[in-house]
Amino acid sequence: MARLALLSVSNKTGLIDLTRSLVEEFDFDLISSGGTAQALKDAGLPVTKVADYTGSPEILGGRVKTLHPRIHGGILARRDVPQDITDLENNQIRPIDLVVVNLYPFEETIAKPGVTLSQAVEQIDIGGPAMLRASSKNFAHLTVLCDPAQYDEYLEELRQNNGEASLEFRQKSALKGFLHTASYDQAIASYLAEAQQHTLIGTQLQSLRYGENPHQPAAWYQTGTTPTGWTAATKLQGKELSYNNLVDLEAARRIIAEFTDTPAATIIKHTNPCGTALGSSISEAYQKAFNADSTSAFGGIVALNRPIDAATAKELIKTFLECVVAPSCEADAQEILGKKSNVRVLTLPDLSSGPKDTVKAIAGGFLVESSDDVIADTNQWQIVTERQPTASELAELLFAWKVCKHVKSNGIVVSGDRTTIGVGAGQMNRVGSVKIALEQAGEKAKDAILASDGFFPFDDSVRTAAAAGITALVQPGGSLRDQDSIKAANELGLVMVFTGVRHFLH
């Protein structure tokens, strides 16, 4: 008797090639439902609709299609249990040898702007997870495939093993099935529960060599069923990504996402920017960012918001870099970068989309906060000094404020010509970060501006900045001693702007 395959998929990638091989090479019969059955029929493949096989029509507008004993009996029957076989025969149920199923696109639906609760609920799959769990449970007797990436491997299994998939492959596929349903249910629960419950489930993509340090095991996980963010990036060349590479790449992505209208480049070391700049071209932006702190740039992570061209590639290979990421890479640029084969070059078309939440583990649980993705708006800023900023100063203040948001607190950025020229990060007191940033800027601090991620608790930071030649400052405001800082700025002829938004980063 021919073997039986049940197919019901939302993602039809690779479906026709798979089923054609099943029919022509391995003598499978096909049963399918809804749009999947129509796709197979349109491709000229012989297929029996689930409704015809079960004798029960689809009802409730398609909500009930595969929830039937002839389906689940065929999936769950144990071939080595005589009573199970007797039950199949008495109920005219064929054993199902292969289940190919993936689920309604719930996550894609809720990601759309303006989606309603009722629209989201209609994308909660019922029959799909039931088939996926049932077939995963019974992996000893059948195979389940829930990802088009599995299709070629499955066919090769059949070709190498006289038309049978190995137990090892079936068990591995069952695990993938359970992970798929767990991730799917997690997305639904998180959506419906809002802040009351937060579940984090990931599928391991890669075992990493180690974590932050060699004695710390680490792995990389994908959340959700669809690759997004770094899981959707393409690595063009270079060694495997490390834990620290990925952490720094995300820090670089967050900064570069602040700038869309103008070519921008940032260089990251230990999650802090050692150089960030805007330019008339991406090559100019990178050179300005590199020259901002060429010593720290050695071994850095570079993010660019424009495609890598040949001119930029020639600059990139002049120093040792761990990683470079950009939306794309031109062919001649890739050839140039190939001269430094160890540098990891990645492309990620959408560098602006990041996680909506930030999660941190603590003893006994974890903390969740919404990501700091507030967009800087100069129309909401308050100029609190007698001197008003020039248009050029205001643009520079905005640039520095966007970068300062991504510097570890206490964070200070000194900038000029849309380039960071001094960065003070992670100091326990704010004036300490101010002094570090100004020392790094040196003579370039004259006529530059300074941004602070938190308010100035005393006027010492204002006076220290003025002594170095700073002409304008931007900070959140909100200190009990704001008037002391404002008074000092007025005495010294400085501009000071309050944003009303704090950007602590720990």
Map each language-model feature to its residues.
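Anion (oxyanion) recognition and catalysis
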Residues: 23-24, 41, 125, 136, ...
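Active-site/ligand-binding-proximal alpha/beta "capping" segment
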Residues: 79-126, 133-135, 381-391
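N-terminal glycine-/serine-/threonine-rich phosphate-binding loop
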Residues: 1-53
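Mobile "lid/hinge" segments at catalytic clefts and subdomain interfaces of large enzymes
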Residues: 131, 138-154
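Hydrophobic beta-strand scaffold residues
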Residues: 30, 47, 142-144, 345, ...
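Non-catalytic interaction/clamp surfaces of large macromolecular machines
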Residues: 149, 153-200, 208
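Glycine-rich nucleotide/cofactor/substrate-binding loop typically near the N-terminus or early
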Residues: 35-106
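ATP-dependent carboxylate/acyl-activation modules
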Residues: 2-7, 98, 104, 184-506
